[in-house]
Regions:
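An extracytoplasmic/periplasmic, membrane-proximal ligand-sensing/linker region
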Residues: 44-45, 132-192
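Structural motif detector for alpha-helix initiation sites
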Residues: 9-10, 105, 167
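C-terminal lobe and pocket-closing loops
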Residues: 78-147, 179
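Conserved functional loop/turn residues at catalytic and ligand-binding sites
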Residues: 9, 67-68, 87, 112, ...
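Hinge/capping helix and adjacent helix->loop/strand transition within the periplasmic-binding protein
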Residues: 1-59, 110, 121-154
Length: 192
């Protein structure tokens, strides 16, 4: 949010939104990851935003800086310069634990808000007819790569946390995310 917003924590935002339903303008990419993230927040907290499609992560920063939106979900790495300059305030992070990348940003849970949301998921996908031995070789190479300290630091420097999941675990996680998205999408369409 902008540094001059009337809220600087999740509880303050929730209280403000409940007092001003539909008035807080949230910049998203409709149908994209941040849209689903916002719909998840609305469902968990009972608030309602005025959602505006403003485009990419950098477009959201421009819109917030220009006062065209009131709040945005964004990657910390994209907004970091604005946070450091004092233009933006990070309300929090929807995770169980604070991030190693931005340890000064409290979690929603720490602020008393019962809301968790999966972070940005990056993974490798191979054509479905890729032979099993090639899949296994690729997986072993990725697992070894993710143990390399230089690779881990490079990922941290980009504002992400390095993690590795086996193909089976990643497939299971994606199935859970798909189910969550389908539920959120159905609820969003029911509102329209």
């Amino acid at each position: 949010v902008s540094a001059d917003a009337p809220y600087s924590t999740y509880p303050e935002l929730i209280d403000y939104c409940k007092e001003h339903p539909g008035e807080v303008t949230m910049g998203v990419e409709v149908g994209g990851f941040t849209y689903m993230m916002v719909k998840s927040f609305e469902a968990a907290t009972g608030v309602q935003f005025n959602l505006v499609d403003v485009g990419s992560h950098s477009d959201k920063c421009t819109a917030l800086l220009g006062g065209h939106i009131d709040i945005m979900p964004n990657q910390y790495s994209t907004a970091k310069g604005y946070i450091e300059s004092g233009d933006f305030v990070a309300l929090g992070f929807p995770a169980e634990e604070r991030s190693a990348v931005y340890p000064d940003v409290p979690t929603a849970k720490e602020q008393g808000v019962d809301w968790l949301y999966n972070g940005y998921e990056f993974g490798f996908f191979l054509p479905k007819d890729t032979p099993k031995d090639i899949q296994d070789t690729f997986d072993t190479a990725v697992a070894e790569l993710m143990e390399d300290e230089e690779v881990q630091q490079a990922i941290l420097d980009l504002g992400n946390e390095p993690t590795y999941l086996s193909p089976a675990d990643y497939e299971s996680q994606l199935a859970d995310i798909q189910t969550e998205y389908e539920d959120l999408w159905a609820a969003a369409n029911a509102e329209a």
